[in-house]
Amino acid sequence: LRSLVGSEMCIRDSLNSQATVNALDTIVGWYRDGVIGPAIMGEQPDGWGGIEAGNYAMIVEGPWFFSSEDKLDTYTPALIPSVDGRSISIVGGEDIVMTSTSSKKDAAWTFIQFLLQDEQQVAMAGAGMIPVTASAMEKVDTSNAPYVDVYMQQLKTAQARIPCSSWPTIETVLNTAFESVLRGDATSQEALDAAAAQIDELLAKE
């Protein structure tokens, strides 16, 4: 899988590499040992329910988890654990998009540029949004929402999903592969080899 355009990940095939196989094997081991809860398979308790009931020690969640102030009294945000010196998460949230068929491209581009100015980014941060530019992050006052600092630090090493129209299908392929391994229907190598072949076909059509 040639993924994550614009990052170091785009220069190598990595989906079914030995490192990825080892990583998935580790996740499967954690799941079988009960280190990872049933939420990974869409079962109960889910992430929020599990951690609030004391079933889970940690969850991976966005800043919206702390929308209720009392959560900061109970939970502490932290960076994604580092592997080989890299702490990587996926960039999610909202997108600003200008479609290729738009009849107002100039106006759309002007509006996008306006939204990405530091002044607007900082203003939106006051409403709970995390700035999407490094320059705006440096100007945000997080005294009323200290958890935001951790998320902004994590964004420095975050990676975006691949920019392609086939992403929803690719996500389904990946989810199916991971689930088959967690259920014991395939080995990590078998599932990832099959997924890589399917995804390469999809990417070839882009």
Could you tell me what each predicted segment is?
Residues 1-6, 10-11:
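Single conserved hydrophobic/aromatic residue that forms the stacking wall/gate
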Residues 38-52:
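Short helix-initiation/N-cap motifs at beta->coil->alpha
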Residues 57-62:
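Paired acidic/hydrophobic, glycine-rich loop segments that form the ligand-binding mouth/hinge
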Residues 63-74, 83-176:
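C-terminal lobe and pocket-closing loops
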Residues 32, 153-206:
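Conserved C-terminal helix/tail region of periplasmic/extracytoplasmic solute-binding proteins
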Residues 20, 30-33, 101-108, 180:
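Short helix-loop capping/hinge motifs at secondary-structure junctions, enriched
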Residues 36, 56, 186-187:
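Conserved hydrophobic residue
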Residues 12-40, 71:
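Glycine-centered hinge/linker elements that transmit conformational signals in sensory
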